[in-house]
Regions:
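Low-complexity "stalk/linker" and mucin-like segments enriched in Ser/Thr/Pro/Ala/Gly
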Residues: 182-197, 329-339, 745-749
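Secretory targeting and sorting signals
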Residues: 1-27
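Ser/Thr/Gly-rich low-complexity blocks that favor extended beta-strand/coil architectures
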Residues: 312-338, 367-372
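M14 metallocarboxypeptidase catalytic domain recognition
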Residues: 27-306, 310-317, 348-725, 756-759, ...
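Short glycine/proline-centered coil/turn motifs in the loop regions
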Residues: 730-732
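Beta-strand signatures of extracellular beta-sandwich domains
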Residues: 174-176, 735-739
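Extracellular beta-sheet repeat scaffolds used for adhesion and glycan interaction
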Residues: 333, 337-338, 741-767
Length: 805
């Protein structure tokens, strides 16, 4: 059963989190620390700020914010913060208005219970069927569906069946077909169907194959010899299928999936479709779902002693125990002994028999003992001098990890599924990746749904076949498997990876275990914290900790490797949650002044907007959900700074058109929702898979675009005497290079730009009668009139900007 000591929903995508003390603002009294220890309950609450400057101040505190930061009619801004009661009090002390609670830990407990119930129900159904099939008169195989349909004149038979032994036996089932009414079964040939396993639970066998004639009846014989027959039904077309045909298959998601289950799904897909897909093990293994065993003895900062095992918890550290004992005699020396897995510290006493050992003395004694230091490391509490007297007590060391043994404790490979008929780098590439942030459970489902659609629709849907034939698609369902497992099994609010970079003089003790890790989406090497940009932290316990250096983490290094080693990748989607945002670069700015990374050109910005419109329209098609214009655009415009994010890496370092989904309105919503427009992981997986598939259509259209743009000059009266206002109008998203001195335009000429943030094209004011020469070029490199800007061509566009009559 999944769960955790601090189960909780709704946490962050590109978010700003801190577990470190924030120093006092102006005033004589120190402010309460903004800090959260393991075991504290957290909730999502509203924080209302006066304006964007106050939002930046809120971000600067390091409080854990989700992506909701929406403007109110009165000009204020409502943000959502993930806080404990103590953190809420600390925000109030800093002058912030903390409002109502939106989500609490019970929400995620309900989500996990829903997942457990779904899995248990499926297991029970399998067991019930297997038990019933033991009867001589009941077949151990049953046919669920047998559908015939055509696509572009080609006939297909799709079959779903359940086998009583399907939970433990991976054998395929063979289907025999007749050739139509009155013909013999077997005369129409055979086809195989394979197991569909989700979250470790067998659901059914499924598959589709081309058939020359429509069968009327099919038969399945199980490995035990039992049989089942069924009539074949016609699969009827439906209206409103968008770009895809009536036979398009979707909805392959039945529950939330842990990282292990995500990888199992893509491995199974690659094994089932070896001609179209392969698994790529990325070069950098994670640190692993593992920790050293720890104990913390004492009750105050001055007398606490931290104990860490030298071995990993699962490799023996969890077997250790420590005891601080009173020797029961006066004038006893401080001593340390080890018997097997038990460490005993006999505390020093004075002439009256009172304990005199301080925390610092106990730490020094343990670390000086060869036997003790071979198995543990001791330290005072968070940099304390350790001058408090130690109390008698004992503890068993624990790594605090609750996942079942099926979750590996070793350094974890990160896997991508690479999909395409041709996967040698010669086709344009698309990259989709999810779960940079551990607690975002819905985005990985979007990647699985997309992979399933691409592979299962290849045979019968012409549009899907075009995509798979034309593109080289990389899908990483979980960038951060360690953090993902920790979020499912231990601390549902976990945002970062699991690597502890905190020194023993800092927050390295057992109480701080839920605040360790690096924010993978702040660890990249483009417009990062280390470059002076805002929205990341140097604190090892901050939710936006950028790491000790750029690309220090294997999780971020893997994404950089994919982009660097595959220059054919031209488009990318980073899937996060939540907030229903759709964003692109620039994603970082420097303070003061919000000086952003370089903005895309007008042509690039226009292309981002145009492609986004297509993608968002397909998302809306599923159930009518619209991502609003206010939540669409560059990250720096619609949200706040996220220094060192992967979108900026892909766009600025590698020239990849890179977007960021923020899926849904909650981070761990119910899987199903009775409200058809409500928060639902299932519905969100479907609607955002629509958008991800549309990105692939955008990529294909980009590659096959050979249409040259056209453009014209629009002249209007100017407020300045003797001057005119000039704008360029293009037939599509295109860059315009122009001159106003009569010279030939080249790529070194002035580039027509935007008027400002989210404003559209600029207006150029020139003297009436100015000769303007120009050409346009679209995102695919098609130049207007086939003009050669760097050659001897003279067929550029030209006009005289005369005052309108």
């Amino acid at each position: 059963m999944l769960g955790g000591s601090a189960a909780f929903a709704a946490l962050a995508g590109l978010i700003l989190t801190s577990m470190t003390p924030i120093g006092p603002a102006s005033g004589t009294e120190p402010l309460p620390d903004l800090v959260r220890d393991a075991g504290e309950d957290v909730a999502v609450v509203e924080v209302i700020v006066a304006d964007s400057a106050e939002l930046d101040r809120l971000v600067g505190t390091g409080v854990d914010l989700d992506h909701a930061a929406h403007a109110n009619p009165d000009g204020t801004i409502t943000a959502h913060a993930v806080v404990s009661d103590g953190e809420a009090d600390a925000l109030r002390a800093r002058g912030f208005a903390v409002g109502k609670s939106l989500h609490d830990e019970d929400d995620t407990e309900a989500v996990l219970a829903e997942r457990d119930a779904t899995i248990a129900e499926a297991v029970a159904a399998n067991e019930e069927f297997a038990e019933a099939a033991e009867a001589a008169d009941i077949s151990d195989v049953k046919i669920i569906r047998a559908d015939y349909y055509t696509s572009f004149g080609v006939g297909y038979l799709s079959v779903e069946a359940k086998w009583a032994d399907g939970q433990t036996n991976s054998s395929q089932l063979t289907i025999e077909r007749d050739s139509g009414p009155g013909t013999e079964i077997g005369s129409g040939g055979t086809q195989n169907i394979s197991r569909f396993v989700d979250a470790g639970v067998y659901l059914y066998h499924r598959g589709a194959a081309v058939v020359e004639t429509r069968p009327d009846t099919i038969r399945i014989t199980s490995p035990s010899g039992d049989t089942a027959t069924a009539k074949v039904a016609d699969w009827l077309p439906i209206d409103g299928d968008g770009a895809f045909g009536p036979n398009y298959q979707s909805d392959f998601i039945t529950s939330y999936l842990t990282p292990t289950e995500l990888y199992d799904r893509v491995k199974a897909l690659a094994a089932e479709f070896p001609q179209l897909a392969e698994i790529v093990e990325l070069p950098y293994e994670t640190n692993g779902y593992r920790r050293h065993a720890q104990a913390l003895l004492g009750s105050t900062t001055a007398n606490r002693v931290g104990i860490d095992s030298v071995a990993w918890g699962h490799e023996g550290g969890n077997d250790l125990s420590v005891a601080f004992v009173d020797p029961g005699a006066a004038d006893s020396p401080l001593s340390v002994s080890v018997t097997g897995d038990d460490l005993t510290v006999s505390l020093a006493t004075d002439a009256s028999g009172a304990i005199t050992s301080t925390a610092a003395q106990v730490v020094a004694a343990i670390n000086a003992s060869p036997a003790a230091s071979a198995i543990v490391v001791a330290y005072t509490y968070r940099g304390s001098t350790g001058n408090g007297l130690v109390s008698v007590g004992s503890a068993d060391l624990s790594d605090g990890l609750s996942a079942p043994e099926s979750v590996s404790r070793d350094p974890h490979p990160v896997y991508a599924i690479r999909i395409g008929k041709t996967r040698d780098g010669s086709k344009p590439g698309v990259l989709a990746y999810a779960q940079e942030h551990a607690r975002e459970w819905v985005p990985p489902l979007v990647t699985i749904e997309t992979a399933e659609r691409l592979l299962r629709n290849y045979a019968q849907d012409a549009e899907t076949k075009k995509l798979v034939n034309a593109l080289d698609i990389w899908i990483v369902p979980s960038v951060n498997p360690d953090g993902g497992h920790y979020s499912f099994y231990d601390f549902n609010s976990q945002r970062k990876n699991m690597t502890n970079h905190c020194p023993l003089t800092g927050s390295a003790d057992y109480n701080a275990r839920n605040s360790w890790g690096v924010d993978n989406n702040r660890n990249y090497d483009t417009y990062s914290l280390f470059d002076g940009y805002d929205g990341a932290s140097t604190s090892c316990t901050s939710g936006t900790y950028a790491g000790p250096s750029e690309l220090s983490e294997p999780e971020s290094s893997n994404i950089d490797w994919i982009a660097g080693e595959n220059p054919n990748i031209k488009f990318a989607m980073n899937l996060h949650s939540s907030g229903n945002y759709f964003m692109w670069s620039p994603g970082a700015y420097a303070l003061p002044g919000r000086v952003s990374a370089p903005r895309p050109t007008l042509e690039e910005e226009s292309y981002f907007w145009g492609a986004s419109s297509r993608i968002l329209s397909e998302i809306k098609r599923y159930r009518g959900m619209s991502v609003t214009p206010a939540r669409t655009g560059p990250i720096a415009d619609v949200l706040y700074s996220a220094a060192g994010n992967s979108g900026d890496l892909l766009w600025y370092k590698y020239g990849i058109y890179a977007w960021n989904f923020e899926v849904g309105t909650q981070f761990q919503p119910p899987f199903e929702n009775e409200n058809p427009t409500g928060a639902s992981a299932h519905a969100e997986s479907q609607e955002f898979a629509n958008g991800l598939v549309e990105l692939m259509r955008v990529a294909r259209d980009f590659e096959t675009d050979e249409k040259r743009p056209s453009s014209k000059v629009v002249v209007s009266a100017s407020a300045e005497p003797g001057m005119v206002d000039v704008m360029f109008d293009t037939s599509e998203a295109a860059a315009v290079f122009y001159t106003v001195d009569g010279s030939k335009p080249t790529y070194a000429s002035t580039l027509y730009a935007s008027a400002g943030v989210r404003e559209g094209a600029e207006t150029i004011t020139v003297p009436a009668g100015t000769r303007i020469n120009w050409f346009s070029v679209d995102s695919a490199g098609n130049v207007e009139k086939n003009y050669k800007p760097d050659g001897s061509g003279t067929n550029f566009s030209t006009t005289t900007a005369n005052a309108p009559s």
